[in-house]
């Protein structure tokens, strides 16, 4: 029987830990799972980092170590080969199935990952319409002949809601919107992402002063070199597909192996690009008013996170979260 502070399985929210790279998400996820276990509740981690799903890409993606995975069971790590392609639509299907499986066993899923769209795809009202190369090509040809303005005028007629949320000077997005309308027969606006949970969730964000985050990224980049990242890339390079090859750091090391740059410049570039990625991630996550931000350096981090989870399970944030989509679209605009 649940104690006064222990939630019932049917009220337990999925916990999603978000934040920039190197902010400590993996460590907090493990700590939360162990704290829940101490209260008599089982919890397991579901990876939401796009590149940690690839086998053999361990050092460059900062994958949870074997020791960390032994502490708490992890899911959706090492599930595809480097020459396979993981898309956010494919991940959404896999992740939701895994979450449902865990919940059926009364195990609380803890979603951990730095890929913002992937984390949201698992829990939010987001759909991913298919593409049609022939339709896309025809629209691109029309844009060259008629101009972007003509296509945007067509979009305003076919889907005024989508047009109102889009930049008229971005023909790529206009073409995508018209493509979706033609392929699906539905308004493009129906597929735009919403800040609306389809799986009850509480999101915890990790924040760090920029100087500390930069310091951690520098340390991590140095450790990547020391731990054999060059050898990792050399080993998997023959099987590195287009999608997996987009993981930050891998192409830089490939260029080094091809003699296009020296080792020091390679890892300096990786550190600089990682810092830029971290800024971008903070901008992405910063738009979501449902995230409960915690200072990662606070000694009381775990206790604060557990308190947020307890309040979420009690339904204390439900009313505010329900207003998030309307608030975000009104104040910040569309992000798609």
Curated annotation (Swiss-Prot):
InterPro entries: Dimethylallyltransferase, IPT, P-loop_NTPase
Keywords, ordered alphabetically: ATP-binding, Magnesium, Nucleotide-binding, Transferase, tRNA processing
Binding locations of ATP: 19-26
Residues reported in the UniProt entry to bind substrate: 21-26
Gene Ontology MF term list: ATP binding; tRNA dimethylallyltransferase activity
Cysteine disulfide links: none
Pfam families named among the record's database cross-references: IPPT (PF01715)
Marked site positions, Interaction with substrate tRNA: 115, 136
Reaction(s) catalysed (UniProt annotation): adenosine(37) in tRNA + dimethylallyl diphosphate = N(6)-dimethylallyladenosine(37) in tRNA + diphosphate
EC numbers, comma separated: 2.5.1.75
Names of the cofactor(s): Mg(2+)
Any one GO biological process: tRNA modification
Tagged with keyword Translocase: no
Top-tier EC class: transferase
Purpose of the protein: Catalyzes the transfer of a dimethylallyl group onto the adenine at position 37 in tRNAs that read codons beginning with uridine, leading to the formation of N6-(dimethylallyl)adenosine (i(6)A).
Subunit (UniProt): Monomer.
Record family assignment: Belongs to the IPP transferase family.
HAMAP family recorded: IPP_trans
Protein name: tRNA dimethylallyltransferase
The gene coding this protein: miaA
């Amino acid at each position: 029987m649940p104690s006064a502070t222990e939630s019932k399985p049917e009220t337990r929210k999925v916990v999603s830990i978000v934040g920039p790279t190197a902010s400590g998400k993996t460590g907090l996820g493990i700590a939360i799972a162990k704290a829940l276990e101490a209260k008599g509740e089982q919890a397991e981690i579901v990876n939401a980092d796009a590149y940690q799903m690839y086998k053999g890409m361990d050092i460059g993606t900062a994958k949870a170590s074997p020791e960390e995975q032994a502490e708490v069971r992890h899911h959706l790590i090492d599930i595809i080969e480097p020459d396979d392609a993981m898309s956010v639509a494919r991940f959404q299907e896999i992740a939701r199935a895994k979450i449902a499986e865990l919940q059926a066993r009364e195990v609380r899923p803890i979603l951990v990952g730095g890929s913002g769209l992937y984390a949201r795809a698992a829990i939010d009202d987001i759909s991913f319409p298919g593409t049609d190369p022939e339709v896309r090509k025809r629209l691109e040809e029309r844009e060259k002949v008629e101009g972007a303005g003509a296509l945007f005028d067509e979009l305003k007629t076919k889907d005024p809601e989508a047009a109102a949320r889009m930049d008229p000077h971005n023909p790529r997005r206009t073409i995508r919107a018209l493509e979706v309308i033609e392929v699906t027969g539905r308004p493009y606006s129906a597929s735009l992402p919403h800040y609306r949970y389809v799986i009850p969730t509480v999101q915890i964000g990790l924040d760090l002063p920029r100087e500390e985050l930069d310091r951690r990224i520098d340390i991590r980049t140095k450790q990547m070199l020391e731990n054999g990242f060059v050898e990792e890339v050399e080993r998997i390079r023959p099987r590195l597909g287009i999608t997996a090859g987009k993981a930050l750091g891998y192409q830089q090391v490939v260029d080094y192996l091809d003699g296009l740059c020296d080792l020091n410049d390679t890892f300096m570039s990786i550190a600089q690009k990682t810092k830029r990625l971290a800024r971008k991630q903070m901008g992405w996550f910063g738009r979501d008013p449902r995230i409960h931000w915690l200072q990662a350096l606070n000694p009381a981090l775990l206790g604060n996170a557990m308190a947020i989870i307890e309040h979420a399970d009690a339904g204390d944030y439900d009313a505010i979260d329900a207003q998030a989509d309307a608030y975000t679209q009104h104040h910040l605009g569309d992000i798609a």
